[in-house]
Amino acid sequence: MDSGEVKISLEDSPSSGESFASTTSGPCCGSGRDLDIQVHESHIKDDQFPSRATSELQESKKSNKKCSSDLSTENSYAANKNVAEGLMDIALLSANANQLRFLITYNDKASTYIYSMIMVILSLVLQLLVGIMLIFKRRLKRFRNRSYERTNDLLVMGVFMITVINILLAAFTTTDGGGSH
């Protein structure tokens, strides 16, 4: 059955740094990774070539499906964003702990000592509560019920309160402590 020879090659080979799965998903993307079909016309006439394969390729070019490499780019962005947010949370937590140490050590005679101390402790407690709620939110995400929505609302309010408290804390903290330790 030597009626003709069909060669199918990929523009990007698996050795080009991508995984084999993302390379073979080319027809779904419509992003330049379409299969090149070369037909030796000496062996096959145009009416003998299966039109199903060419019509599938043309339809896949028109579709807007995302490649797995496109999805991994979005997942990578989300992961990097989450890491950056986590690092910012840790920085805020350590800054508040350092401010608490500063208040206790050097600023215990300041006129705003009690207000600053209350706000630092309140901010630290709220940060811990928000962190614990984030853990539970992840577990509740599977169910998407009313408690998930309530937890999400409480988290937004908690983050807002932490922000307001830290702005007020920056305004009320003074360095006019009379104690020299």
UniProtKB/Swiss-Prot annotation:
Residues spanning the membrane: 116-136, 154-174
Coiled coil: none
Region named Helix alpha1: 80-91
Annotated compartments: Membrane
Key words, A-Z: Cell adhesion, Cytolysis, Membrane, Transmembrane, Transmembrane helix
Chain residue ranges for the region called Helix alpha2: 94-110
Ranges of compositional bias, category Basic and acidic residues: 1-10, 33-49
Transmembrane as UniProt keyword: yes
Pfam family, any one: Ninjurin
Extracellular compartment spans: 1-115, 175-181
Entry GO terms, CC: membrane
Region of interest called Disordered, as start-end residue ranges on this chain: 1-72
Record has Membrane as a keyword: yes
Bias (Polar residues) ranges: 12-26
Membrane topology recorded in Swiss-Prot or TrEMBL: Multi-pass membrane protein
UniProt family annotation: Belongs to the ninjurin family.
Domain-level remarks: Composed of 4 alpha helices: 2 hydrophobic transmembrane regions (alpha3 and alpha4) and 2 alpha helices (alpha1 and alpha2). Alpha1 and alpha2 feature one hydrophobic side and a hydrophilic side. In normal conditions, NijB is inactivated and alpha1 and alpha2 helices are not inserted into the membrane. Following NijB activation, alpha1 and alpha2 helices insert into the membrane and drive NijB oligomerization via interactions between alpha3 and alpha4 and the hydrophobic face of alpha1 from an adjacent subunit.
Function: Effector of non-apoptotic necrotic cell death that mediates plasma membrane rupture (cytolysis): oligomerizes in response to death stimuli and promotes plasma membrane rupture by introducing hydrophilic faces of 2 alpha helices into the hydrophobic membrane, leading to release intracellular molecules that propagate the inflammatory response. Also acts as a homophilic transmembrane adhesion molecule that promotes cell adhesion by mediating homophilic interactions via its extracellular region.
Protein name according to UniProt: Ninjurin-B
Lineage summary: Eukaryota, Metazoa, Ecdysozoa, Arthropoda, Hexapoda
Gene name as annotated: NijB
